[in-house]
């Protein structure tokens, strides 16, 4: 291979070290420019569109654009009976559907003035914690993918499949379960499911250890997350944070402990709290919460006794199918429930649950009819999304991707 020969006619001033070359290498000020991030980008976690004002590779401002997944859910609920309104909640935060159902079911029960059987409460608590683990596995592995770690995602989807099978065994559906109903749950656990869940709960902590062996002390992972997207305690409270994002900033607030619902007052668990409030702390909080959720699942299995799984008022819950074959009254109840629904006394309530992403609330107004007069939904991710601008400033573009992943945003509930 021959050496490269410069053309003989090139002036010496243009060669390296010449006057013209020196003049061409002076420093140029880079003007700020706009960069559209999403909604097609895989790191946008759905349909997030960010308009980033960049100064070179540094984020000067981040403007989130919402509404691309708006379906008018709150208005649609006003035209449905209470039983038919419930499935809409599965489609809000579609990563943790049963926790969304739980909020609406509790709100409706509060307006009806009913108390569900003890076994139904234990089933709800157990599946709410299974849902929390489902959510955190997906978030942590997706965050790993955003930062370049592929292996956790492969392990995570394999582990999530086991939990989705529990969903399917209990409700008949893998995702949109429609399982938590006002008055209890739709049906009892099938034979053998409790043993399968107990066996999974025994081995799951070892899976968490494997996940941490890949990430927690990995120096590349820490370089991508430590000190990135810091939010102080004062900022988190001022911006309306909740859930893991709030606890990562040092506030030990958890609705399961502060305002217990169903049977959360009968289980023991710790509330993980961090101090720094960065992406790494939000990761650690979710890892610790998965360990606590397994503890709660095991306590539910230990304390769950045989019994009814819904109230016996068949104007609110459907009668057993065996009764419908021999009782005209049961058949009428079933027909009326799934056509006209039931009438809820006039009143209003705000009911919130500790969903995997934070406080998910339902403000439900009843006017005495068989349809909600108003159903205002308090999504968990809306407050977190609005803080992206504050969190991302003065960070590199690649850090903005890690910040978005650590906030655990799902636009089904944000856009509604």
UniProtKB/Swiss-Prot annotation:
PROSITE patterns the UniProt entry points to: COMPLEX1_49K (PS00535)
One cellular component (GO) term of this entry: plasma membrane
Role played: NDH-1 shuttles electrons from NADH, via FMN and iron-sulfur (Fe-S) centers, to quinones in the respiratory chain. The immediate electron acceptor for the enzyme in this species is believed to be ubiquinone. Couples the redox reaction to proton translocation (for every two electrons transferred, four hydrogen ions are translocated across the cytoplasmic membrane), and thus conserves the redox energy in a proton gradient.
This protein's name: NADH-quinone oxidoreductase subunit D
Gene3D superfamilies, sorted: Cytochrome-c3 Hydrogenase, chain B
Location in the cell: Cell inner membrane
Pfam families assigned: Complex1_49kDa
InterPro entries: NADH_Q_OxRdtase_suD (IPR001135), NADH_UbQ_OxRdtase_49kDa_CS (IPR014029), NDH1_su_D/H (IPR022885), NiFe-Hase_large (IPR029014)
Alphabetized HAMAP family for the sequence: NDH1_NuoD (MF_01358)
Superkingdom per UniProt: Bacteria
Alphabetic keyword roster: Cell inner membrane, Cell membrane, Membrane, NAD, Quinone, Translocase, Transport, Ubiquinone
Family the entry assigns: Belongs to the complex I 49 kDa subunit family.
Top-level taxonomy: Bacteria, Pseudomonadati, Pseudomonadota, Alphaproteobacteria, Acetobacterales
Bilayer disposition of the protein: Peripheral membrane protein
Catalytic activity: a quinone + NADH + 5 H(+)(in) = a quinol + NAD(+) + 4 H(+)(out)
E.C. number: 7.1.1.-
Summary of subunit composition and partner proteins: NDH-1 is composed of 14 different subunits. Subunits NuoB, C, D, E, F, and G constitute the peripheral sector of the complex.
Native source organism of the sequence: Gluconacetobacter diazotrophicus (strain ATCC 49037 / DSM 5601 / CCUG 37298 / CIP 103539 / LMG 7603 / PAl5)
